């Protein structure tokens, strides 16, 4: 069901050796009352004595902003940045931001760890698309887990050549992952439908969902801008 180029998987799996692991868990209840739990194992890579890189936490520099709305920072009249994980309140935060700053046209994603509420996150993505907002990952940007769906929501999407994206399978409270459900089960179709709504053709929507599920929830698959461009149309790389 999930066929991916072995060479791509080998390349991504060998990007860097793990020196240690950090495990984080997040839980949420969707609109149907179903309780979900996602556990992420973060690889910590020793780059030099005394330093480490933890992909599960945001270490982006402070964004200079003129206003804050939940995880969103308003940079100026036409630009905002996502600076933290999203949650159940994020769609309302986004709506409030646009009411106060209706001229915002670009959402920057610098160091985005993901979401603690997948249902709200997909709703937020559709709001970004409906508002006609572009998404951009600048040089050195890192977009992980549920934040990838928000990047894909941009009406125009751009990412620097060195931008990185982390994906993995979801996990419910009973320990089930996508492959434990039929391919046409509502929980699986919801993501494919979302990717279709974000502009992917049927083949790419299914292939990208398969890619995100090619590693279990407790692992992370790293992608880079050219990898993502195989599935979703991107504009010229950020900063070029």
Where do the model's predicted regions map?
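Charged, glycine-interspersed solvent-exposed loop segments at helix/strand-loop junctions
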Residues: 174-240
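Glycine-rich beta-to-alpha active-site loop
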Residues: 129-172
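Extracytoplasmic/secreted envelope proteins and their assembly/folding machinery
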Residues: 91-98, 121-125, 129, 148, ...
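Bacterial N-terminal signal peptides
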Residues: 6-15
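Small-residue-centered hinge/linker elements
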Residues: 27-102, 111-116, 162-203
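Positively charged n-region of N-terminal signal peptides that target proteins for export
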Residues: 1-4
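Short, glycine-/small-residue-enriched flexible loop/hinge segments at domain edges that mediate gating
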Residues: 103-119, 134-140
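Sec/Tat signal peptide C-region and signal peptidase I cleavage site
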Residues: 16-20
């Amino acid at each position: 069901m999930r066929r991916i180029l072995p060479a791509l998987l080998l390349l991504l799996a060998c990007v860097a050796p793990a020196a240690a692991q950090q495990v984080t868990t997040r839980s949420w209840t969707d609109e149907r009352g179903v309780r979900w739990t996602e556990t992420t194992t973060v690889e910590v890579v020793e780059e030099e004595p005394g330093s480490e890189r933890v992909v599960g936490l945001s270490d982006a520099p402070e964004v200079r902003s003129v206003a804050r709305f939940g995880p969103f920072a308003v940079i100026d009249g036409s630009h905002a940045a996502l600076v933290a994980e999203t949650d159940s309140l994020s769609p309302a935060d986004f709506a409030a931001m646009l009411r106060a700053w209706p001229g915002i046209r670009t959402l920057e994603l610098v160091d985005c760890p993901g979401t603690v509420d997948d249902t709200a996150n997909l709703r937020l993505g559709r709001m970004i698309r409906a508002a006609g907002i572009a998404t951009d990952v600048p040089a050195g940007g890192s977009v992980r887990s549920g934040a990838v769906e928000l990047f894909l929501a941009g009406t125009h999407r751009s990412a620097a050549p060195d931008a990185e994206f982390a994906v993995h399978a979801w996990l419910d409270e009973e320990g089930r992952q996508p492959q434990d459900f039929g391919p046409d089960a509502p929980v699986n179709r919801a993501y494919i439908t979302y990717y279709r709504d974000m502009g992917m053709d049927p083949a790419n929507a299914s292939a990208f969902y398969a890619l995100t599920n090619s590693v279990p929830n407790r692992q992370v698959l790293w992608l880079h801008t050219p990898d993502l461009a195989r599935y979703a149309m991107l504009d010229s790389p950020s900063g070029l």
